[in-house]
Design a protein with these regions (language model features):
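Short flanking/linker segments adjacent to small metal-binding domains or redox-active Cys/His motifs
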Residues: 95-125
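Arg/Lys-rich, low-complexity, intrinsically disordered N-terminal tails that contact nucleic acids
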Residues: 1-12, 123-125
Length: 125
């Protein structure tokens, strides 16, 4: 899987997603507190970060532990589980709309993305 270059806004958005999801892996629903172990909990993008239009889309991202992000849901049959989870979370119509957004093009705009992410963080603080 091709990974997009990490930017400062990626770090900000990742922190927002993990805070929104209360620092828990949504796949295994463990109540383990990852707030002191940021490396153990990842911001997983259903559609890759290389797709600029959904890179900072809150419906495209969830918190996953290292296992589910790198081994469980990211590969083979696990991808089917990830898809089923996303459809359940967003509904079929919401998932289909996310799919459409993922296939549109968007020019990178870090300044605008940073403003939008700061506004999102206000909602969870």
């Amino acid at each position: 899987m091709k990974r997009g270059k990490t930017r400062k806004t990626d770090e900000m958005f990742s922190n927002y997603i993990r805070t929104r999801d209360e620092w828990e892996c949504l796949a295994c629903a463990k109540s383990k507190d990852y707030s002191n172990n940021r490396q153990g909990l990842h911001c997983s993008h259903y559609w890759s970060r290389s797709r600029e239009n959904t890179r900072f889309d809150t419906q495209n991202c969830i918190s996953l532990c290292t296992y589910h992000h790198l081994y469980g849901w990211g590969h083979g049959d696990g991808r089917n589980e990830y898809t089923a989870f996303m459809i359940k979370r967003l509904g079929q119509e919401g998932f289909d709309k996310l799919d459409v957004r993922a296939h549109l093009t968007k020019k990178q705009d870090d300044k605008l993305d940073k403003i939008a992410i700061n506004e999102l963080m206000k909602e969870v603080q």
